[in-house]
Amino acid sequence: MTSSDHITEGGRIFASLKKLALPEDYLAIVDGAMIVGYHLGNALLHIHGVLSDAEHANRPSALDQRIDTLPAPIRPAFEAFAELEKLRFDYVRSASTYNDRLASVVWRHLETMQHACRAG
């Protein structure tokens, strides 16, 4: 997928997530946020020449380099993506339960990633 394809797909999934309700759908929102992060993160990696269009990173922890070595313009987005990955582990894969802070954190991290994509 190209960076444009990733941005389009990430935006489509993000719009779908916004239709879900909290707290009822918090697991789907946290899990879906990782999918949005995957698309926006890969778009940024392609745009900044870190990965070719044929290469993809499923999650920040699967990158071949640390976030602090990525190009400066995309570091905040990848820090947000790493936080989404942690939230997914804590809430989807572990036994954490919903709390009101979760909703604002998920949306804030996704908005950080979207902003980086708009900035190019």
Where does each model-flagged region fall?
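Terminal alpha-helical segments
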Residues: 1-120
